Amino acid sequence: MFFVHFWVLSKPPFYSPNPEYPLHNYDTYLIYIKTALFYPLHKFSCFLCVLGSEVIRDQQTVLLFGILIFSIFVALIAINRKNLELDRFAKWYGLLAFGVLTSLELVVTRSGDIANYFGPPEKIFFLPSYRHYPVVFLPLICVYSLSILYSTLSEENKGMIKTSANAFLKTMLFTLLICSFILNFFPGIKTGEHNFVSMSERSAILKTYDVQPDENLKKLHLNPEIVKKRAKKLEELRLSVFAENNILLYKPDEVKLLPKQSQLQGVLRIYNDVKFVLFQHPISNENRSIIVFNEIYIPQNAKLRFSIALHPDVWDPEKGDGVTFEVYIRDEGFEELVFSKYIDPKHNPEERKWNDFEVDLSRYAGRNVTIIFSTLPGPNNDSRWDWAWWGEPRIEW
């Protein structure tokens, strides 16, 4: 895989000398190879760390576990050297080879180099990130599977010494697998939650790519122009996040906001729930803020779905008196209030979340209407700390 990357990345349009993102091009891959040739022992040590990271993620002990796994494999081969049954166990050796090669690729490209992209080349301790685990988890499992096969084979051949030795190695590997499960269970859950939040955030950014600042687009790719180009194609083909039957309301035709408010669109996380948002700070009860979407076609059986919340930073009781969220529909010259909800998470803990709502739009089916979002301060007309957010307002059918 490394050499496929190396060959492909040396050809247009992948090859790029862009100094802002030099990690994947021909010249950089040459640096990775040179580092491996000049520092082979350091790279081997990092490879053992990758093996050990299948059991534990501790900088101080990961190398010891890597040495242990490698030593067990060498002992397994030595004990069964006269009866390896390579043809019979080929699939496990193939998987083992794949796991070892992908681990080596990771070590070569991410464990330090002479250009210092990923730290100094003299590294002897290396922990791969969790996102790389799908490509490095195989060696320990394959070695354990081989130990079971050789243990069974030695029992069939009635070799007492081999049987005892293979059983001992099998027990050691099984113990390592149990330790791996125990040590990585809760960190794995935490990492899964982090990845879920990260993917939700990126999904929200992708859905609204054409209004997102370059800083957010760089979370998808370091070149924002590439994001815009590819996202537009996905949108045209209705693929990925654009495949859903909905109209996301995120590009208003008219706004009247608090003069000091500089941000309209954004991405907000409340607990582990991330949404694209419209920020609408109330002005006053006499001068409502508005966000207007004109000429929105309403399909059959359509519903307006959205979430409302105040930013978690203003949930303290002394910060304001809540916000009223309202939605109006303007149709054929008539304006109708179809939704109104007052929330005050500062004093009502049950509202410290995304509060989900929907409005039935079936009576407007087949027509173009104007949808107006509005916010008002609380009953005391106190607009301080009223950081009001509409979460992913959309029409679904």
Swiss-Prot record:
It comes from the Archaea. It is found in: Cell membrane. One of its GO terms (cellular component) is plasma membrane. Keywords: Cell membrane, Membrane, Transmembrane, Transmembrane helix. It is a multi-pass membrane protein. The keyword Cell membrane applies. The chain crosses the membrane at residues 62-79, 92-109, 135-154, 167-189. This is Uncharacterized protein AF_0303. It comes from Archaeoglobus fulgidus (strain ATCC 49558 / DSM 4304 / JCM 9628 / NBRC 100126 / VC-16).
